[in-house]
Amino acid sequence: MARRGWGSLKTQRSGRIQASYVNPQDGVRYYALQTYDNKMDAEAWLAGEKRLIEMETWTPPQDRAKKAAASAITLEEYTRKWLVERDLADGTRDLYSGHAERRIYPVLGEVAVTEMTPALVRAWWAGMGRKHPTARRHAYNVLRAVMNTAVEDKLIAENPCRIEQKAADERDVEALTPEELDIVAAEIFEHYRIAAYILAWTSLRFGELIELRRKDIVDDGMTMKLRVRRGASRVGNKIVVGNAKTVRSKRPVTVPPHVAEMIRAHMKDRTKMNKGPEAFLVTTTQGNRLSKSAFTKSLKRGYAKIGRPELRIHDLRAVGATFAAQAGATTKELMARLGHTTPRMAMKYQMASEARDEAIAEAMSKLAKTS
């Protein structure tokens, strides 16, 4: 290796020249990413490296090469690669892909990853408008996650997604009483009426309910448990079945005895077409998976009947959660029953139950005064 004033040149057996130097900042030897067929080009590379160090703008040659290559990678190309390589459930991957296809690629898809800036992100965010706030927020979260990975890959120095999003308004929904639930359920098509009671009293998610099969029911005649392992969701025009939403979502849920009796009767009378272990617990009259649209249609009639047309399917989860809290379930017990990973929602139901308890006490006192 020929010694020089700065850096080294080594002639290889092939006759080509390899250039390298020791960076005084970290004491590490760095090599040119290519060899040269003449000394002049090799020395020019060394001179350029020395100049970067003196100007304090030096970064490792490998990082610069990676960034240069990335300058040709568009956001769409990088995002598609990200979706393939990311450890995501199939349903989540399809969901993220849908947000990217509809809201990210049409506007930002041709922009190079290295050219993504906060100004571009702000313009894209504003251009989506406010008509669909949830979809807008989800698309932004996908873009932010992709850009976080670009930072980790050292393609960009910092994430350009810096918009402060307001948390979605949390709906405070008063849970149905058992009497109101009966009125609502009476309006639901009889073949899948049991769905309302299961959702309400076991606090399952709708996607978990429609993927429940006979093999997921453990029943010794005294105690019934539902083994929640999977969930189904509609992504575009197809139903995607995957593992439950989170690790904690995989759980056994004990069914209140009065609902267990309903389920036993339902299995005897309503699932005659298929009694195998893979048979869905709740189906259409044709034995197919219950759709959200079909269930919602009759559920809305029930909600209107009790003067609560604003309620949604998901609000049925609050029934079982609230009454479990009133029955004395601890935060940890509620988290386990609901399949939550954080205590926030469980504590919300506990607070609701405490508020209800105070109202009951007030009503009791009024009775005493009138007696």
Curated annotation (Swiss-Prot):
Superkingdom of the source species: Viruses
SUPFAM superfamilies referenced in this protein's UniProt entry, alphabetically: DNA breaking-rejoining enzymes
Active site as annotated: R205, K245, H314, R317, H340, Y349
Keywords: DNA integration, DNA recombination, DNA-binding, Hydrolase, Transferase, Viral genome integration, Virus entry into host cell
Domain Tyr recombinase: 171-362
Residue ranges occupied by any Core-binding (CB) domain in the UniProt entry: 73-151
BP GO annotations: DNA recombination; symbiont entry into host cell; viral genome integration into host DNA
EC number: 2.7.7.-, 3.1.-.-
A Pfam cross-reference name: Phage_integrase
Subunit structure: Forms a complex with host mIHF and attP DNA (phage attachment site). The complex binds attB (bacterial attachment site) to form products.
Stated family: Belongs to the 'phage' integrase family.
Protein name in the entry: Integrase
UniProt organism field: Mycobacterium phage L5
